[in-house]
């Protein structure tokens, strides 16, 4: 029974997801429905967490908008997510960057990773 579930989940997974890690700046383009119109909305920020669970994988992106921190959790393989673009690679030593929530301004900066693997 579990083989059937795995096969169905494998078919549903996107193949064009780029490789990114916590600390990277990414731009996520999301389909937004407003009334009868559909349009793409971009959300650009720092990846602060990644949850790898196959089809149920998700990642959290944080940005500062008008001086207020905004975090959004995206399902990696969701049809709502149109594209993910890595803008800048960040050099961090932790998997979860929740400490950035308490920091602002220059203290919240992340060094750029030079050797992109």
Curated annotation (Swiss-Prot):
Keywords associated with the record: Ribonucleoprotein, Ribosomal protein
For the biological process aspect of GO, one term held by this record is: translation
Which InterPro entries does its entry note?
A: Ribosomal_bL19, Ribosomal_bL19_CS, Ribosomal_bL19_sf, Translation_prot_SH3-like_sf
Q: Which GO terms describe its cellular component?
A: cytosolic large ribosomal subunit
Q: State the Gene Ontology terms under molecular function.
A: structural constituent of ribosome
Described purpose of this protein according to its UniProt entry: This protein is located at the 30S-50S ribosomal subunit interface and may play a role in the structure and function of the aminoacyl-tRNA binding site.
Q: Which HAMAP family match?
A: Ribosomal_bL19 (MF_00402)
User: Do you know which PANTHER family this protein is assigned to?
Assistant: LARGE RIBOSOMAL SUBUNIT PROTEIN BL19M (PTHR15680:SF9), RIBOSOMAL PROTEIN L19 (PTHR15680)
Q: Which family does it belong to?
A: Belongs to the bacterial ribosomal protein bL19 family.
Q: What is this protein called?
A: Large ribosomal subunit protein bL19
Q: Which organism is it from?
A: Proteus mirabilis (strain HI4320)
């Amino acid at each position: 029974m579990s083989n059937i579930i795995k096969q169905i989940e494998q078919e549903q997974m996107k193949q064009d997801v780029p490789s990114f890690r916590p600390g990277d700046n990414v731009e996520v383009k999301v389909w937004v429905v407003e009334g009868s119109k559909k349009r793409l909305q971009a959300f650009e920020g720092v990846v602060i967490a990644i949850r790898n669970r196959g089809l149920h994988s998700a990642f959290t992106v944080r940005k500062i908008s008008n001086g207020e921190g905004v975090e959004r959790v995206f399902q990696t393989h969701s049809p709502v997510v149109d594209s993910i673009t890595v803008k800048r690679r960040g050099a961090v030593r932790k998997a979860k960057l929740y400490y950035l929530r308490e920091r602002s301004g220059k203290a919240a900066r992340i060094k750029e990773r030079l050797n992109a693997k």
